[in-house]
Amino acid sequence: MARVTVQDAVEKIGNRFDLVLVAARRARQIQTGGKDPLVPEENDKYTVIALREIEEGLINNQILDVRDRQEQQEQEAAEIQAVTAIAEGRR
């Protein structure tokens, strides 16, 4: 199944080099970033899960960029709130 997934995923992304980058980025998110897979895991490795997500059109580079920006903004907002709370506590 992985071979078919790779061919279909290449068609979704455009070329195999970008596919490698997007799939690796997504697999890393699933493995270490605490991101939940968007497809059933079915005992697959993280890279295969990432390829299946790409094949189904659930993940691409733009989607990953938007999600990363949203997370960064949320993290920055939380940091600002923490600094504000500390500053108000010193008054």
Curated annotation (Swiss-Prot):
Name of the top EC class for this enzyme: transferase
Keyword line: DNA-directed RNA polymerase, Nucleotidyltransferase, Transcription, Transferase
Keyword Signal: no
EC number(s) on file: 2.7.7.6
Pfam families, alphabetized: RNA_pol_Rpb6
InterPro entries: DNA-dir_RNA_pol_omega, Pol_omega/Rpo6/RPB6, RPB6/omega-like_sf
Signal peptide: none
Gene Ontology CC, one term: DNA-directed RNA polymerase complex
SUPFAM superfamilies for this protein: RPB6/omega subunit-like (SSF63562)
Described purpose of this protein according to its UniProt entry: Promotes RNA polymerase assembly. Latches the N- and C-terminal regions of the beta' subunit thereby facilitating its interaction with the beta and alpha subunits.
PANTHER family reported in the protein's UniProt record: DNA-DIRECTED RNA POLYMERASE SUBUNIT OMEGA
Protein name as catalogued: DNA-directed RNA polymerase subunit omega
Origin organism lineage: Bacteria, Pseudomonadati, Pseudomonadota, Gammaproteobacteria, Enterobacterales
